[in-house]
Amino acid sequence: MTVRRFTLLLLLAALLSSAAGPALGEGMPAWEYPLEPEILDDYDQYITLANRTHLLSGDYVPADLVNTTCKKASDAGKPQLRQAANDAINAMFAAAQEDGYTLYLKSAYRSYKTQKTMYNTRLERLGRDDGLVSYPGASDHQTGLGVDILNLEWTKKDGMNKNFAATGEAQWMAAHCQEFGFILRYMEDKEEQTGIKFEPWHFRYVGPEAAAYIMENHLSLEEFTEEWQAYINAWEAAGGNFRQLIIERSKVNAVTVIDVSDDGEEEVSIFY
């Protein structure tokens, strides 16, 4: 069976090569960015930026929102997250528990309408924008990937502030979040880049590969976005075609072997 499978894959690879014309990436400079191009293509919108200069539309609602199944603060209501973020937060909470830290979800997805109400209410009360409530469309929470996480003591407090960073839970999350695809979204020394004050409780799901790169290089999501966009621009200026690269790679990756027959025989299918 192994020989048959290998032979079929070689045959299909040859057919794909002849049908596609030039070899994968032929004539293009080598792709040397540390992350795969598919991650930057962001089909799943995991690295989508939401801030004052990258506003989400008023009707933007993630398609795969689910009710969260992790431990929640008593006043959290019925928070929702995108499916991947929900799976990841459950894994992170379980790992934290094993290390002796109990985490509580305080806030997750927030609609544009809710964010607008919160922003206007605070603006009317203070008479100014103090930066503590994001402008409508600029909230990380609207992506369905941003979360506020606290320990039990802090869920009982009226408000959140940077002193939460001194807790064991905050320190554990800052050290381990990337293992589950999360980043510390608003770092203490990145206020100039993010436009948001330090929030040791706010984490953002971006996927494990991007999270590892961002956290290991101590980047804000803004800096990461600027960096990879600049790389693609320079790569294309040198003769690359990012869209064509994605298309060609998707054709190669579309060759899969699946078992669909009653007798266990393998069949090869190609999906474009």
Regions found by a protein language model. Give the residues of each.
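Sec-dependent N-terminal signal peptides of Gram-positive bacterial secreted proteins and lipoproteins
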Residues: 3-25
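Extracytoplasmic cell-surface/polysaccharide-interacting catalytic and binding patches
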Residues: 24-108, 112-272
